[in-house]
A protein has these predicted regions:
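Bacterial N-terminal signal peptides that target proteins for export
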Residues: 2-14
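Metal-centered catalytic cores of metalloenzymes
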Residues: 2-4, 18, 23-76, 80-142
């Protein structure tokens, strides 16, 4: 009977460790981001601002929301470029209510984009009618 209990305990321990390992692999890195006109390239003088959290999983999944104020945003994206440079959009954000912009369900980065994230070379950009290239921006710094 002792052997049976030990075997059950060993099996339960292995199962728990396996679940823990899977959850670590899928865990996300939460990055707080603040968006301002000063971060734009070139800089924009604006009272608009934004803040939020973007989570990037080790499986390259992307989730999160940024909340903006003082801006009537017409589009928002996560772009690929280092601070001080402009780059192409890689994830289009979905406009919600009250100035909220969220990642679409199932959003994922490519391997190249994930490496760029780890190097600090992704940013969130909110565009307005007055500033089509972007009015506020915030670099994602892991």
């Amino acid at each position: 009977m002792t052997t049976h209990r030990a075997g059950k305990m060993f099996g339960s321990t292995c199962l728990a460790l396996g679940i823990f390992a899977v959850s670590l692999a899928a865990s996300a890195e939460d990055v707080k981001v603040t968006l301002t006109g000063a971060e734009e390239v070139p800089a924009v003088t604006t009272k608009a601002m934004g803040e939020g959290t973007i989570a990037i999983g080790k499986d390259m999944s992307v989730s999160g929301t940024v909340k903006t104020t003082g801006i009537e945003g017409v589009a928002a994206h996560i772009h690929l470029a280092e601070a001080g440079k402009n780059g192409p959009p890689v994830v289009t954000l979905i406009k919600g209510e009250g100035g909220a912009w969220s990642t679409p369900p199932g959003a994922k980065l490519t391997e190249e984009q994930y490496k760029a994230f780890k190097a600090g070379n992704l940013y969130v950009n909110v565009h307005s009618a007055a500033h089509k290239g972007g009015e506020i921006r915030g670099q994602l710094k892991p």
